[in-house]
Amino acid sequence: TAGEISNITRTTAGATNQAFIDICDAAYWKVRTGAQSYTAAMLEGVKALGQLQPIVRYPSGHKDTLEVAVLRSIRTGVAQSSGNMTIQQCKDMGWNHVLVSQHLGARVSDTDPIADHAGWQGKVYCIDGKDAQFDNLLDATGYPENPLGLCGYNCCHSFTPFLPGVSQNHNKPIDTEANRRAYEL
């Protein structure tokens, strides 16, 4: 790419962490193309970074170990690019709805509905606008603008095209207390 695509993982690591950004971008491409698993790419990235810096410092002052920072960066980058491709696929098909995945142990927030992944997971949303049956994707999940929401920092959720009247949501409600317990482990 001759330097045209950089910081694809959109890490917020500071400018002093350019090596971290470069290594995360390389790991992202290895995972995204199927050349390596998340774990293999993370381990390779950690090994390379271990030669350069022991921890990653973010502009917020937050610090992470290399393993955590690299894996989070790869996961976030893959989720964001997958989300962008799904939105484009929906546009190409003329569809305006998506179904968000769900999992036990989804992030919980009692103060921010966007950061409360447990609250919006497993549901169908409108990409543009909203209708009588489904809420707006951006308003409900923060996608693609809020880094605390869907496909944001360390988010494991994905979403797929959904056509009301044809597609079906087979997600079963997850008990909120069971989810909270799993999240807090």
Q: What name fits each language-model region?
A:
Residues 1-150, 162-185:
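Domain-core detector
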Residues 154:
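Extracellular structured ligand-interaction cores
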Residues 157:
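Catalytic core of tubulin tyrosine ligase-like
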